[in-house]
Amino acid sequence: MVRVRFAPSPTGHLHVGGARTALFNWMFARKEGGKFILRIEDTDTERSSREYEQQILESLRWCGLDWDEGPDIGGDFGPYRQSERLEIYREYAKKLVEDKRAYYVVYDKEDPSKELFTTYDYPHEYKEKGHPVTIKFKVLPGKTSFEDLLKGYMEFDNSTLEDFIIMKSNGFPTYNFAVVVDDHLMRISHVFRGEDHLSNTPKQLMIYEAFGWEAPVFMHIPLILGPDRTPLSKRHGATSVEHFRREGILSRALMNYLALLGWRVEGDEIFTIEEKLQSFDPKDISNKGVIFDYQKLEWVNGKHMRRIDLEDLKREFIEWAKYVGREIPSLNESYFTEALRICREKVNTLSQLYDIMYPFMSDDYEYEKDYVEKFLKREEAERVLEEAKKAFKDLNSWNMEEIEKTLRDLSEKGLASKKVVFQLIRGAVTGKLVTPGLFETIEVLGKERTLKRLERTLQFLKKT
């Protein structure tokens, strides 16, 4: 059976690179009818925290990447936190020493970087006197090779590696040792991970060989890069799933975009993961690094916002607003839906949607500075607004065609140019100069709300 794992370290928020790795593992497991395991690698006691662990789990859930075994739900091969598996690592390290494939190293008390001697016998006396003791793995002469699913045949000369620590003096395992023990005991069949782990692979394969265990199939995925073609990091800007969630990126759009980063997809590049799941083949992943393009992500998100059902968008919008602490007032359902329908055409994120929707959700909007300076302060502004109020008041049929005719008739009276008339009205009823189409905006706002807002703007004008 296919068994893959995603094994983050809880030292920060989930990075988009980690999310993409999790996605590729998840897709492979789901397509093959296998298991997706979540393991927490928290042996870095100084930097790891349960708070970050919970945030990572929450980000994965939001991404729609559910797991079959993990720290929160258990499973047949737990525990699923490395910090809860210390005795397991110690026992297996001891076995390597017994087989003379590893040995103890005793260090100077005053200078812990200075090795005093090595031994196959546990140095009780020195340990009791406070000497640091580690266990090192013995690198044998020869070559280590494996077939990478993406990169093909890989070979390493063992002479380039020195004996390396597998158990630290604090009793915790090093990464390369713990990951081998865990992957073997959890029966992991495939390891898909970033190519930054490629240099770890020969060490891990040596440990597999020393135990006489079969190694999993490895695939090392090229990293996500910043615009300068260096690995994507905080210096390039936001890199966490949490950030993009708060910015108003839909989870389906983020997964869509991350899948596009390296996976050669046939057909339309706007899709849900479920739509492309059966066509996923890890061998279709590119062997070249890919640049993370924030603008492309927003574009993909905008496509999804206009692609999904309005009710789904409404639910996503309300959930997002609650998550980031933005208020959405209780509004008439059909009015809210219509406002959402016209506003989603102009924006690419839920955050932008909130800003453009605000005048539809609240009468207490502010007037943009440009609107006040460029239009409201014009000497003809008051007359245009008064005439518009009168014309709308007399309007019997409140629809887009009649609203357009009314405004065009008004602009032909010679009070101001058509642009000035339209922008004066637009800003009066929304406070903004960029909105959905003016005629449909006024239609959705309705007659009563439009008249009140024209009057509100006239009062504001008189005060300034």
From Swiss-Prot:
GO terms for molecular function: ATP binding; glutamate-tRNA ligase activity; tRNA binding; zinc ion binding. It comes from Thermotoga sp. (strain RQ2). Its main location: cytoplasm. Signal peptide: none annotated. Monomer. PROSITE patterns: AA_TRNA_LIGASE_I. The lineage of its organism: Bacteria, Thermotogati, Thermotogota, Thermotogae, Thermotogales. Belongs to the class-I aminoacyl-tRNA synthetase family. Glutamate--tRNA ligase type 1 subfamily. ATP binds at K234. The keyword RNA-binding does not apply. One of its GO terms (biological process) is glutamyl-tRNA aminoacylation. The gene is gltX1. CDD domains: GluRS_core. Disulfide bonds: none annotated. Catalyzes the attachment of glutamate to tRNA(Glu) in a two-step reaction: glutamate is first activated by ATP to form Glu-AMP and then transferred to the acceptor end of tRNA(Glu). The keyword Repeat does not apply. A motif ('HIGH' region) lies at residues 8-18. It comes from the Bacteria. InterPro entries: aa-tRNA-synth_I_cd-bd, aa-tRNA-synth_I_codon-bd_sub2, aa-tRNA-synth_I_CS, aa_tRNA-synth_I_cd-bd_sf, Glu-tRNA-ligase_bac/mito, Glu-tRNA-synth_I_codon-bd_sub1, Glu/Gln-tRNA-synth, Glu/Gln-tRNA-synth_Ib_cat-dom. It catalyses: tRNA(Glu) + L-glutamate + ATP = L-glutamyl-tRNA(Glu) + AMP + diphosphate. This is Glutamate--tRNA ligase 1. A motif ('KMSKS' region) lies at residues 231-235. Keywords: Aminoacyl-tRNA synthetase, ATP-binding, Cytoplasm, Ligase, Nucleotide-binding, Protein biosynthesis.
